[in-house]
Amino acid sequence: MAPNAADKCPVMNNTGEKCPVMSSSTQSRGPRDIYTLEALSHFNREKIPERAVHAKGTGAYGEFEVTADISDICNIDMLLGVGKKTQCVTRFSTTGLERGSSDGVRDLKGMAVKFFTEQGDWDWVSLNFPFFFIRDPAKFPDMIHSQRRDPQTNLLNPNMTWDFVTKNPEALHMTLLQHSDFGTMFTWRTLSSYVGHAFKWVMPDGSFKYVHFFLASDRGPNFTDGSTAKVDPNDPDFATKDLFEAIERGDYPSWTANVQVVDPKDAPKLGFNILDLTKHWNLGTYPKGLDTIPSRPFGKLTLNRNVKDYFSEVEKLAFSPSNLVPGVEPSEDPILQARMFAYPDAQRYRLGIDHLKAPLRRKETACQHDLGPEFEKWLSQVTSEAWSHPHEDDYKFAREYYEVLPEFRSQEFQDRMVENLCKSIAPGPEELRKRVYDTFELVSSELARRLREGAEAIVAEKARPDSPSRAQPGQLRL
């Protein structure tokens, strides 16, 4: 009986070719099963290096719709025309730890969006806080290392963080926020994200405005009442699961896009440097002595489709704040300038030199243009002191955040932040603890006193001979 068509149909094997698969592995003269060799070769190379930061993540597809006319301040094609829609892909992530870490770790959270515009890809690379630990890019490697695992024990060691913070007071503002409940209470669907940096939106005549834009979750602030997420503490992927299952059942999360605008002539009058990433553009909460920079809603982002293949559609995603479109330009912010180099450089290492040819990056229209508006002189110049030097604002913004918490949230919210700080400070050696107290004395005498009393009480409790938590050999070191 002649073989039928199904019998003749070749099998796709690991070489990528359609041909019958042989099972013999070796002959007298050595290996000859090229399919086994190819399968082993593929297995040895199927993983790629994880991201240097933001390694743990998840993603989904969606669309962005313009909801308000902002043509008076904007000449970006994607944002011109109420009702205009643009497809996009979004990746959420933790920041400091490795790919297998928990979604709920006390850490910054990232939300990166790649918009597939008619003029190329435009990336919004954002964090869940509108400011950062540092303003000098030279400090970035040390800052990240201070929040990772101890190189000797491979355990998290808060002493490394406090050693960095006490030597770099511009990090105090971010440190206080991270140790409040804002540092842990979230789901990806309720996360708001901020680009942090000042960008320039440039008009056809060459004039521009400094802008800061952000995405506010339509589900409201994360746990407004200060409660914690109702999740299984043993599930490190609770936020990832929550996002995926919500989209699968049609409960699509959405965010409102907002922009804050500063005329370059007004920038020197604001009382702080808008290019300093350790400070935020005041929305009216704090600092009370500085002008409010109101936000203006202009669009809505909705995520409505899960990925089919996590590795190719999320793990291989490549974002960069340098992926811009005509009408938007970077500011002189030193951290932004450094990120525009570091992100593509990291992708060349992680994904290879041809990462720009990945399917998610391909568009029917070219991504390189000569359409950008030009201008020859500054309308105003924002100048800065040496970025590495401490400044009174480093303490002022941290002080005002501490003082506004009972009004902004609740006294219990502030108390929990102090408790979290005390637990983090207490394992350190006496010399480091004293340095922490002295540093916070420059922020607030009341806060320094509460930290000293709380942390030293924990130290005394652990030193008791009958204490179950008494420090054992191999305790956290500096």
Swiss-Prot record:
Q: Which residues of this protein are catalytic? A: H54
- Any idea which positions bind heme? Y343
Q: What molecular function does GO assign, one term?
A: heme binding
The annotated region (Disordered) lies at: 459-478
Q: What is its EC number?
A: 1.11.-.-
Cofactor requirement: heme
Q: Which cellular component appears as one GO term in the record?
A: mitochondrion
Q: Which Pfam families match?
A: Catalase
Q: Which SUPFAM superfamilies match?
A: Heme-dependent catalase-like
Q: Which UniProt keywords apply?
A: Alkaloid metabolism, Heme, Hydrogen peroxide, Iron, Metal-binding, Oxidoreductase, Peroxidase
From the UniProt record, give the pathway where this protein acts: Alkaloid biosynthesis; ergot alkaloid biosynthesis
The protein's superkingdom reads Eukaryota
Q: What class of enzyme is it?
A: oxidoreductase
**Gene3D superfamilies xref list:** Catalase core domain (2.40.180.10)
Q: Name one GO biological process term.
A: hydrogen peroxide catabolic process
Query: What family is this protein classified in?
Result: Belongs to the catalase family.
Function recorded in the entry: Catalase; part of the gene cluster that mediates the biosynthesis of fungal ergot alkaloid. DmaW catalyzes the first step of ergot alkaloid biosynthesis by condensing dimethylallyl diphosphate (DMAP) and tryptophan to form 4-dimethylallyl-L-tryptophan. The second step is catalyzed by the methyltransferase easF that methylates 4-dimethylallyl-L-tryptophan in the presence of S-adenosyl-L-methionine, resulting in the formation of 4-dimethylallyl-L-abrine.
Q: What is this protein called?
A: Catalase easC
Q: Please state the gene responsible for encoding this protein.
A: easC
